[in-house]
Amino acid sequence: MVKYTEDRLLELKEETYIPQPQILEAFNQMIESVKEHAAAEAEKHKAIKWNNGDTYIDEHGNERPYHHMNRRRASRTANKPSLRKKSVENVDEDGWATLSKPKRSFGADEGLEERAKFRESVREGTVGGSGTVKAKPNNKNLGSSKAVDPRDAIADKHTTTFNAFEALGDGDDDDDDE
């Protein structure tokens, strides 16, 4: 692709030839009419909208109505802070930029010593007698008369399974053993 400087483009502008200037003029007029129509539609929509005529000029110089300032209920989305950490861009000596992912939790570095101490004590067996963590059952539910879940009862029932190797080993059916 050929690249031109700004000066070269200005020189070429004078030398260019538009074969049909009436088509270009009609196209420009059509664009202007579309812009005018869009502005008229926006003005019509603005007039239809509820408005008591009481407006003010905001910091950007736009005329705005007051109805957005005194709502009955506060906006739910405006008060939520964005708690996601931004990814940090690291540039190495070669000029490559990599984005490092932020850590998931905000207090990731806070409990490292206690966590390591607890894991070490579990490995050594100081928490429980034989290296396991002992847990007390919830005694209030042990003697309840609550019905047993039927899915657990079905899981405990012994079922006969089909053994394919046994079926291949026998040449005859099981009914002929009598």
Curated annotation (Swiss-Prot):
InterPro entries: Caf20 (IPR031456). Residues 113-123 have a biased composition (Basic and acidic residues). Keywords: Cytoplasm, Initiation factor, Phosphoprotein, Protein biosynthesis, Protein synthesis inhibitor, Translation regulation. GO terms for molecular function: eukaryotic initiation factor 4E binding; translation initiation factor activity. It is found in: Cytoplasm. GO terms for biological process: negative regulation of translation. Signal peptide: none annotated. Pfam families: CAF20. The keyword Phosphoprotein applies. The keyword Isomerase does not apply. GO terms for cellular component: cytoplasm. Residues 61-155 are annotated as: Disordered. Acts as an inhibitor of cap-dependent translation. Competes with eIF4G1 and EAP1 for binding to eIF4E and interferes with the formation of the eIF4F complex, inhibiting translation and stabilizing mRNA. Belongs to the CAF20 family. This is Cap-associated protein CAF20. It comes from Scheffersomyces stipitis (strain ATCC 58785 / CBS 6054 / NBRC 10063 / NRRL Y-11545) (Yeast).
